[in-house]
Amino acid sequence: MSEPTPVNDDEEAFAESTLTQAIENQIESNNPPAAQATLNKLTLVGYERGDILNLMAHVLATEIDAMLAENRAFDTQWYETALRALPELPPEKP
């Protein structure tokens, strides 16, 4: 088994930026509706927008990692449930 390739800072910044933009697009298009609902909920309880986007991006990254590892389609139901559970982060998938 090969060792994972280390991620450099530029790649990490690009991934973070891309995930954040994906979340912004979901909020703007209200698709899935859980994206806007999560933003509203966390804003009401005092979270800053940047922190909310980071939490939501973490959930998106978790699902994308699982999707790629398991060679399956994106699980929209899991994703929406995990968004609605924020600020509690989902458990890391094996």
Please provide the spans of the model-predicted regions.
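Structure-specific DNA junction-binding interface
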Residues: M1-P94
